[in-house]
Amino acid sequence: MKHLLAFTIVLNALLTWQNSQAAEPTHHEADVCVYGGTASGVMAALAAEKEGAKVILIEPSRWLGGMTGGGINHLDWGKGNTVSGSTYKILMEGLEVKEQKHHGGNAILGIGNKQYRERFKKAVEDRGITVIHEHRLGKVQVGDATIDEPTRQQPIAMGEDIAPKGKAPSIRSIILDYAPFDKTGCPIPEPKKRNAITVSAKVFIDCSYEGDVLAMSGASYTWGRESREHYKESLAGVRPNLWLHDIDPYVEPGNPESGVLPFVQDRKIGPLGSADDLTMGYCFRYVFDGSGKGIPIPEPTDYDPAEFEVYRRAIRDGVDIFSNRHMRTSLKKFTVHKKKRRVPPMLYRCG
C-alpha cells in the first residue's frame, strides 16, 4: 500500500510538471516587440507601454540592462550630465552619489551592476511588461519568407548608403530558440530547443548590440563610422587616439618581417574625419570581486602565451594597464575589425 501511494504521488507530480510545461505559451502577440533588454531596449519598451501599446521585451540573457547592468559603468555612462529624463529616473533617482574626475569629465560613481539590473527589472514589472529571458533569435518571418541568415550589406567606407526602392515587406514575427547561458554567464554555442517561441507584433524594435533582427529583416543597413562629410558632423569619422604607447608590435621585436603579434591589426588608420568599417568589440567579460565565492577558473585548453605578449611588453615598458579598479578586476577588450572571427581573452588596442 505504501509503495502504491508513493507511486501515485510521483505519477501525480510528473503529470503536474508535464501540464505546466505544456501550459507554457509558445506563441505571443503584441503591438510592439522589443528585442534586446539593453538599457535602450528597456527604455523603448517603457516608452511604448506609456503610449498604450501591449509590449513584449525579449532579452537572451538572464537580466536586463545590457552594459549598464553588466558592464563597466563609468565607461558606459560615466558623465552624469549626459543622463536625464526617464533614464535618469531609473538610474539615479534617490541615490547619494559622488563624483570624481575621469577622462576629463565628472564620472558618476554610484551603485553597481546588480542594483542597476534590479532597477531595470522593477521599472518593467511595475508597468506589467512581459519579459522573455534566455531565448535568442532563430528566424525572422518577413512577408511570406522565413529568414534564418543575416543579409549582407555594404559598409559606409566601401559604398553609398542607399535604401532599396519601393515598399519592402514588413516583419510578421520572429522565432526564438531556447538558449540559456552557461554557468559562466556566456551564450551556449547551440540552443537547447529550436523554434521554442514565436512572437508576432505590429512593430519590432531591435535594441540588441548585435542587431540580428535588423540583419535578418531585409532592411538596408550599414556599419562602421561615417565620414565627417557624410552627415556634416564635425566629430564623425576617425578620431585621435586617447592613449598612445610605444609598444613593439612585431613577433620578433624590431623585425617587421616576423609578422605582428596576435590580435594586433596590421592596417593603417585613415585620416581624421574619414570613414572606416570598424565596429565596437562587444564581448563578455569575467569579473573578480575578491570574495572567494566565485567559480574556479580552469586553465584554458587552447592557452597560447603569445596572445598576452602585448601585455607583457606594455608592463615591462611601464604602461599602467590596471590604473583603476575596473581594469584590475575584469578582462576586457575594445575594438575589432568586422572580419575577426575570434577575440582574445583580453586585449588593449595598441598601435
Protein language model features and the residues they cover:
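Boundary at the C-terminal end of the N-terminal hydrophobic targeting segment
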Residues: 20-22
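N-terminal Rossmann-fold NAD(P) dinucleotide-binding loop
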Residues: 41
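Conserved N-terminal/central alpha/beta ligand/cofactor-binding core
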Residues: 47, 53-54, 58-170, 201, ...
